[in-house]
Amino acid sequence: MKLYKKAAACLLTAAMAISMLTACGGGGNGGNGGNGGKPGGNTPSPLPNNPDQIVLPDIDEGGEGTGTKPTKTPIIDVNNSKLAQFDKKYAGATEFYVEMQEVDYGKDGSVARSIDGRAARKGENCYVSMATLGKNNKQQLIETLMLKNKSTWDQYLLFRSSKAAIKARSQDDVDLSLGALIANKQPTQMWSTEIKVGPTKYYAEVYKYYSYEYTTCFTADGNPVYQFVRDLNEKQLISATLYKTIQAGSGTSKGLCALPTGTKTYSFDDNTGSLTDAKGNVFTLKENGTTGFKVYDQAGNDVTNDFKWLTDFFKMMSGQ
């Protein structure tokens, strides 16, 4: 694969990873709220490393519990569910901040991957970051900004410490709302139940979406705290999400929804393997057997050292 195709693949992978985080509807904690319209609630325990510490209802169409499994009760009017009420309460929120942790489990029940994610919105602009740690203990940190540009949103991959950003793609629509972070589509059939996470019991609501079952736990004041996803075909828990912080209202986005001062922006041409900065200067990527690639300016000067952040990014995305 040509270098610029590899670069394009890395950029796309990073952009898609962020899209998956925001579109999956996973997550949960209404903790750390306070006054001024911010959701509040108790601070939950960290996600268990052992999924056996999470006691969920049986996977079936019925509602009766079996043995130590909790019972599911149909919610007659899903519009009165805590999930729907949360979505309704914050449907118009144009500034917020969410901090979450997700754990993905392997078929043997062990932790296959953990993700620490943050999402923020202010007006039409959005920010999402995710730090991923796999079984190889190698961490990937991806930050992205979706900035409104006339009728579309430009998505930038942000390299904060190097004060650089690459435009990865443009989108016609961005749905980053508090409700969408919990459930990307409001279900039409739901059940209520009570489940245990470690020693603590929580009121929870269950619904199915395609071949997956979602169980969302709530604090006493109606804020999401955990969400668990099970594969209905494999009949096993595949992920658990904890919302560590949910805040809504003026000032809660923490200044994340804009490019940091002094950031240099670049667009990437995946047909030519070149970067173009805001002033129109073009930088070309060329393969190098020793370092992987080199970067040259329009005069043919080697400026690779000025783009070390890009080298580090490619190494991170390729697992090196």
Predicted regions mapped to residue ranges:
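Sec-dependent bacterial lipoprotein signal peptides
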Residues: 1-22
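N-terminal leader/targeting segments and the immediate start of mature chains
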Residues: 23-126, 252-320
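Tryptophan-centered short beta-strand motifs
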Residues: 70-75, 163-169, 173-175, 202, ...
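Short amphipathic beta-strand and strand-loop transition segments with alternating hydrophobic
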Residues: 84-86, 186-196
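Short, solvent-exposed coil/turn segments at beta-strand boundaries
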Residues: 90-97, 118-127, 146-154, 198-202, ...
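An acidic-aromatic
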Residues: 111-180, 225, 236-239
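Gly/Pro-enriched, hydrophobic low-complexity segments
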Residues: 129-143, 195-266, 270-277, 282
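Short, surface-exposed linear segments at secondary-structure transitions and domain or protein termini
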Residues: 153-154, 173-183, 225-226, 248-257, ...
